[in-house]
């Protein structure tokens, strides 16, 4: 969906084999069953997934989230945009999501809804494009259009100076947490998903600097209360500020978890490697250790990133000021080392399932930002083999194209 391509994983056998179905992506450029644009194709695809040993499916509902809760600006002169609108609305009205969830469960495959909580869109004049002839649709949630102040903002003192990070909300606001929980429930309550997977990725244009945004009024007020510093007018401890902002995301996860406990559904979260949220957001602390040790989450997916540099060449120069950046390997140990030393032991101790996306830890795109360019496939195969030997790793993804039939008539 929306230009974020399918995450590439590996076809090797792990303890569990999970499949990422980015529905809005697979409905384009494909034929036959793999297109998944009708309920019947979904049924046929699931039969193939079961036969090929898929244990869990993360089914992306973001296209339908946009359809229901956002204003979408569709250029009628671009066939791709017209087709997206037509297929998405028809699929929703014909109950494609309900079919997918129920058929998955009948097949003995766990069904998780994948929803993004950091991607509320932007006005048409703001959202990036791919260049001439490759325009991309723009969308913006009605909630953020009507409540612009809830978007994370910069350190400007006056409203006329203030800049916002389009699409990214500040979870310090109770109304933001309430809105997003209701958005999640629009799918998790309506359909019998086994769990909810929260994605921390975004199509939003990145900040000019990793610490540019995060100075909303609730954060300013709480920081002053705790530390006696006005972060709009005085110098302050950046690490304390980054940690405080991360606490609000943790609060949101606790609220989601509390609701899911009433429905018997599990909570999974996808993050980049490391202690910070990273590109294209900033240096907000990701309190994954607390999430695991307090069992706020049931499953942790490591390596789940936006890939702003490899996917979007027009944004390749924007990675600046990040303390940790998985895409560039900045400030991070090799993922194998982190899994053995940090993630694996802690997740095993507290009974939290640990999944890894190996395809996001080696370079298989040729982009100038990487200097040496793409790495050979052998690098990825070696990495997968190593990850499969690490205690505590529950599973890795299988590639969509490896388990889904692509032939047949439209």
Predicted segment positions?
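Substrate-binding cleft of secreted/luminal carbohydrate-active enzymes
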Residues: 56, 296-315, 326-336, 342-345, ...
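Short, acidic/polar
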Residues: 33-50, 176-187, 279-294, 373-389
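Aromatic-lined carbohydrate-binding/catalytic grooves of carbohydrate-active enzymes
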Residues: 54-92, 209, 306-329
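An active-site-proximal structural segment forming one wall of the substrate-binding cleft
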Residues: 45-54, 100-105, 168-203, 386
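Aromatic-lined carbohydrate-recognition surfaces of secreted/lumenal glycan-active proteins
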Residues: 110-122, 197-204, 240-284, 351-363
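Aromatic- and glycine-enriched glycan-recognition loops and surfaces
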Residues: 34-52, 79-105, 178-182, 247-254, ...
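Catalytic domains of carbohydrate-active enzymes, especially glycoside hydrolases
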Residues: 40-67, 190-195, 296-302, 387-396
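Active-site-adjacent "subsite" loops/lids of carbohydrate-active enzymes
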Residues: 16-39, 113-190, 365-376
């Amino acid at each position: 969906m929306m230009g974020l391509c399918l995450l590439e994983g590996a076809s090797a056998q792990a303890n569990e084999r999970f499949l990422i179905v980015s529905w809005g992506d697979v409905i384009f450029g494909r034929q036959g069953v793999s297109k998944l644009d009708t309920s019947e194709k979904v049924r046929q695809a699931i039969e193939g997934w079961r036969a090929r040993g898929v244990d869990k499916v993360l089914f992306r509902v973001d296209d339908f989230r946009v359809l229901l809760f956002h204003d979408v600006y569709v250029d009628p002169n671009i066939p791709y945009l017209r087709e997206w609108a037509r297929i998405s609305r028809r699929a929703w009205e014909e109950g494609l999501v309900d079919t997918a969830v129920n058929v998955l469960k009948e097949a003995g495959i766990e069904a998780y809804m994948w929803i993004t909580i950091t991607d509320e869109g932007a006005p048409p004049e703001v959202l990036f494009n791919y260049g001439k002839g490759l325009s991309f649709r723009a969308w913006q949630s009605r909630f953020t259009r009507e409540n612009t102040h809830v978007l994370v903002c910069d350190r400007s003192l006056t409203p006329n100076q203030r800049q916002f990070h389009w699409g990214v909300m500040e979870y310090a606001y109770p109304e933001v947490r309430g809105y997003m929980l209701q958005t999640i429930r629009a799918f998790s309550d309506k359909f019998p998903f086994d769990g909810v997977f929260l994605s921390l990725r975004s199509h939003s244009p990145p900040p000019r600097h990793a610490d540019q945004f995060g100075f909303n009024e609730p954060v300013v007020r709480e920081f002053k209360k705790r530390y006696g510093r006005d972060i709009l007018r005085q110098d302050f401890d950046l690490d304390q500020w980054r940690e405080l902002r991360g606490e609000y995301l943790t609060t949101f996860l606790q609220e989601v978890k509390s609701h899911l406990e009433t429905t018997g559904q599990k909570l999974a979260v996808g993050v980049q490697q490391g202690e910070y949220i990273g590109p294209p957001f900033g240096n907000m602390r990701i309190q994954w250790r607390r999430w695991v040790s307090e069992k706020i989450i049931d499953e942790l997916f490591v390596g789940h990133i936006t890939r702003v540099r490899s996917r979007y060449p027009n944004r390749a120069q924007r990675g600046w000021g990040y303390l940790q950046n998985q895409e560039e390997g900045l400030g991070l140990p090799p993922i194998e080392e982190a899994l053995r030393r940090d993630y694996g032991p802690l997740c095993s101790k507290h009974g939290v399932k640990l999944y890894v996306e190996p395809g996001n830890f080696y370079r298989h795109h040729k982009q100038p930002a990487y200097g040496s360019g793409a790495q050979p496939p052998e690098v990825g195969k070696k990495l997968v083999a190593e990850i499969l030997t690490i205690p505590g790793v529950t599973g890795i993804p299988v590639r969509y194209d490896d388990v889904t039939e692509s032939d047949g008539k439209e």
